[in-house]
Amino acid sequence: ACLVGSEMCIRDSIKNMWKGSYMMRVELITHTPEPEKVVATAAKLCYSSSDIASLREGLTEEKTKSFIERLVSIGHESPMEHVSFTFGIEGISRACSHQLVRHRIASYSQKSQRYVSESGFEFITPPSIEAVPEAKAEFDKQMDQLLECYNKIANILTNTHEKAFLEQGMSEKDALNKAKKKAYEDARFVLPNACETKIVVTMNVRTLFNFFQHRCCNRAQWEIKAVADEMLRLCKQAAPELFKNAGPSCVMKGKCPEGAMSCGKLVEVKKIYGEMNNVE
């Protein structure tokens, strides 16, 4: 979907937004097998006296599709919590991951800056900075300075801690390893929001619906919007009926909840996310 104003189209941004910088990657690692049939089975159980095996046997592809359409139309979303999707996300900034983890009904595993050295950290350059040579030069200079500062502090702390551990009777190998970990813990305080991170995310379908409503919106910050759009594309490939109407609130609910802050592009946004159903 396209961002407001002069920002580039999200469909192109997955390939181009990080051009000249660190590339974002979103991978669907795994998901519940037969996701649509699982949802349909769970939902049908609520209204049937049949045993579960019989319910599953009676769910043809057409019946599953029909049942899911009905669930979505009446807003019966609790059966969708039985299906989860796990994503591997790389090449995003810490600024982006901080927004991501605010979606609380989910599971996250993120690369630690406490236990992993950032001695050569990659960073994400916003497109608006990338497009202006003067801003880009200043941004890169600051990243270089922060990297140098991080390494200096890490080395100073490593030497300090190593000396203390040796005095406590540790072996040289153990003292050095423990000193490095302890140094990373505090040296990371100088790292910028631009610092690249990696994270594994698991969400159930109901949570994904809520996530897409907020983060696929034109008013979402550009980076997490790009992540959300790519996650949605992958979900649509894996479970097209479940996610057929997924997207920002104006797509899922039929109207924009932003009031005076609306982007005013409801028709255009609906068209873009409708076309996403046909993209593989």
Where are these regions (language model features)?
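Family-specific signature for flavin-dependent thymidylate synthase
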Residues: 16-280
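Short, small-residue-biased leader/transition segments that mark boundaries at the very start
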Residues: 2-10
